[in-house]
Amino acid sequence: PNPKVAGKGAGILRAAGVQVDEDFMRKECDSLNPIFFHYITSRTPYVIMKYAMTADGKIATKTGASKWVTGEASRMEVQRLRHRCMGIMVGIGTVLADDPMLNVRLSEGNSPVRIICDSHLRIPLDSQICQTAKQYPTVVAYVPERESCIKDSCQEVYRQEKVCKLEQLGVRALPVSDRNGQVDLRK
C-alpha cells in the first residue's frame, strides 16, 4: 500500500457505507501500473533496459558502419517506452560513439530527463546532448576529482571550466559519489 494512505482508504469507504472487496483481480489491477507498484513496494526506480545486438552477439560492425541493428517496429517501441519514462540514462561511451539525441520522436511525446554517466567529464560540448540541453532537460553525472588524484592545478581548472561551459549550455553538471572511479549508480 501507498504509505501516504497506509491502508486507511478501505476503512474510510467502509465507514461511509461502501462495500469494499479487497484483492479482487489483484494481479490484473497490479499490472495496470507496474511502475508505481514497483516503487511503492521496493523504493527503487523501475528500470527498463534497452539493448540491441546482432545474431552473432555484436552491436556494430568492426568499422562501426552499421547504424541500425533493430527494425522500425523496435525503434517505435523504444519511442513509446521513452515517452512513459522519467529519465533515460546512458554512459559516456554511447555519447562518444553515437552522438545520440535521447529524446522522444513521437508527435505528442514527453522527452524524459537525459542522464549521462561521465565520471571524467569527457562529453563533447558540441555533442547533440549538450547542444540541445536547453530544449531537453539534461544531467551529466560526474565524479569530482579527489585532492590526492589531481595531478596539477591546471587539471582542476579545466574541470571547473568544463562544468561552467556545460551549465552555460543548459546541462546540469551533477557531482556524484564514485565506486572504483566510476559513477556510483547506487547512491
Roles of regions detected by a PLM:
Residues 1-28, 113, 146-150:
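Zn2+-dependent cytidine deaminase-like catalytic core
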Residues 3-9, 28-40, 67:
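Histidine/acidic-residue-rich, glycine-tolerant segments that coordinate divalent metal ions
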Residues 10, 26-33, 75-82:
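Hydrophobic, well-ordered secondary-structure segments
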Residues 38-42, 46-55, 59-187:
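Active-site ligand-binding patch in enzyme domains
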